[in-house]
From Swiss-Prot:
GO terms for molecular function: serine-type endopeptidase activity. The lineage of its organism: Bacteria, Bacillati, Bacillota, Bacilli, Bacillales. This is Serine protease SplA. Its EC number is 3.4.21.-. It comes from Staphylococcus aureus. InterPro entries: Peptidase_S1_PA, Peptidase_S1_PA_chymotrypsin, Peptidase_S1B, Peptidase_S1B_tx, Trypsin_dom, V8_his_AS. PROSITE patterns: V8_HIS. The active site is at 74 (charge relay system), 113 (charge relay system), 189 (charge relay system). Pfam families: Trypsin. GO terms for cellular component: extracellular region. Keywords: Hydrolase, Protease, Secreted, Serine protease, Signal. It is an enzyme of class 3 (hydrolase). Belongs to the peptidase S1B family. It is found in: Secreted.
Amino acid sequence: MNKNVMIKGLTALTILTSLGFAENISDQPHSIAKAEKNIKEVTDATKAPYNSVVAFAGGTGVVVGKNTIVTNKHIAKSNDIFKNRVSAHHSSKGKGGGNYDVKDIVEYPGKEDLAIVHVHETSTEGLNFNKNVSYTKFAEGAKMKDRISVIGYPKGAQTKYKMFESTGTINHINGTFMEFDAYAQPGNSGSPVLNSKNELVGILYAGSGKDESEKNFGVYFTPQLKEFIQNNIEK
């Protein structure tokens, strides 16, 4: 992999809060996209597709079934430093879906940066996970020039885990590798990449170190990867 490629998600080195992640964060505003105009904050994440997106301490994940989240291996591994907690569709103004402890992690056996995270059904606040999220459906496929959106938690600790959505275009697909130009930053690792129907095409895992808005990279969900995920959804 090009040395300019950086993993987006290993930056949340802070103390946990009641939300599950960081405290004593500055109240000063933070710029998420200095040059891009295709990114917006999602202030109310209580409806689909936003309520299928969850925050890890240093990244993002997407709900695909009962108690089942898809994210990156590097996010799932690093999250145990932060007490294995996941926050369901947290946003700045909308009602969040609760904070959930991780039950177990199933890593994809191949080279792809893909992992399944199962959470306990009841949150620390007594909420039911499956009643407070939606399940994102898989896309049948995707191709170059398809419009996509990326939803997640860029610079999560710095922004107090505000949710953001960016849009862009798929530039290249080769096997399980996908390149696109939707804006992303550290914290977007594991973010769902959705098509125009809000169906799941894949997840983001890395980006260009030269210019984060130039190009980003994702795990494209081939039939084989979708089968792996579906076989690991809790029954």
